[in-house]
Amino acid sequence: MSCYRVEGGFPVSGCIRVCGNKNAALPCIAAAVLTQEPVLLQNVPDIEDVAVMLTIFRAFGGSVERRGNHEYMLHLPQLQTCEVPCEAAQKVRASILFAGPLLARGRKAVLPPPGGDVIGRRRLDTHFLALAALGAQVRLDGVFTFSANKLVGCDVFLDEASVTATENVLMASVLAEGVTVITNAASEPHVQDLCHLLNAMGARVSGIGSNVLTIEGVSALHGTTYTLGADFMEVGSLIGLAVVTRGALTISDVNVRDLRPLGFAFKKLGVIWSEQEHAVSVSASQDLRVNYDFGGMIPKIDDGPWPAFPPDLTSIMTVVATQVEGVILIHEKMFESRMFFVDKLITMGARIILCDPHRALVSGPSALHGSDLVSPDVRAGMAMVLAACCARGVSIIRNVYQIERGYERLVERLQAIGVRIWKEG
């Protein structure tokens, strides 16, 4: 099994380009099932989850042509099967995103339970109830089987603002009869990317960026070319890396509009950056002190549906907080197992009290030391990389497949900005 060897204590420096949004690439690959014509996706990150989604797309009879480093031409002129292969589905949670497109085009979808990160209970009921509202029959018997004679638009109220459920209903409803209104829809930048792609294919989606989406069904979609937005999760990770290593870093190809929720959270830790049109620069001279709430109350960083702070970055913020003077509460509201990785930080010397599965109280700054670590999921794995980079000595990080599911050519790109990291095994 491959692992990362990281020698900590060296500041990053230079410039790094942020990759395309992983969470936009996955539903956009699924959306290519909706048309018989070619769809060219640009700025697609070269990561494991994308590779798995492309494997599933090929299983339906589709062709995938790679054009350059980050461009893929997807073409599915004839849908040969509506079954998602089991082995691939169990590698990535986003395999559930093929339910909506397969229902819309083939009137059937058969999916094994999806895999992905083990970060807590991740219910699928919202998907089932929403697709059933459009007219699908749902059967659960070891696999998930969806079928429909036709899909008819309706008012769909999601019982939670689930990103993937919103995306599934979007893709199912663009070819449905009539009008669909999704209330309590997710509005993250990657959901907006999917909406813009669908409209470029001939769909009629309005309310993009809000929590109410209106979809007027059309008879067919056509091919298009679409460029995915920047991965703001990666931007947040790289900002955190610069902070914990006391480095100066410029991150390019950034959509600065997506960083507002991140800015409020980082400022609680004394972290600021400067913004250019498509870049952010982090200075090496940061006054890393917790900004306490009025009255001297301990502040907290908590997550929620967009535009709240994204849950995928709570692990990163936990590591950053270990290097900041003061006490702060990290409250992971959405996933009850995501904070369990902090026991590894504690073995490295971090002063963290895990209050319960959702909350960690972090006191800093802590002098971390190298350790032997195992990545439990993609975001905690990247957080461990940050911890290793600021720790004294050498750290070994295992199960790096989890990290590479979400971060493109991580070792090569981090080496280019001064991180002493090597992949072994």
Swiss-Prot record:
It is found in: Cytoplasm. It catalyses: phosphoenolpyruvate + UDP-N-acetyl-alpha-D-glucosamine = UDP-N-acetyl-3-O-(1-carboxyvinyl)-alpha-D-glucosamine + phosphate. Phosphoenolpyruvate binds at K22, N23. The active site is at D117 (proton donor). One of its GO terms (biological process) is cell division. It is an enzyme of class 2 (transferase). The keyword Endoplasmic reticulum does not apply. Keywords: Cell cycle, Cell division, Cell shape, Cell wall biogenesis/degradation, Cytoplasm, Peptidoglycan synthesis, Transferase. This is UDP-N-acetylglucosamine 1-carboxyvinyltransferase. It comes from Treponema pallidum (strain Nichols). The lineage of its organism: Bacteria, Pseudomonadati, Spirochaetota, Spirochaetia, Spirochaetales. The gene is murA.
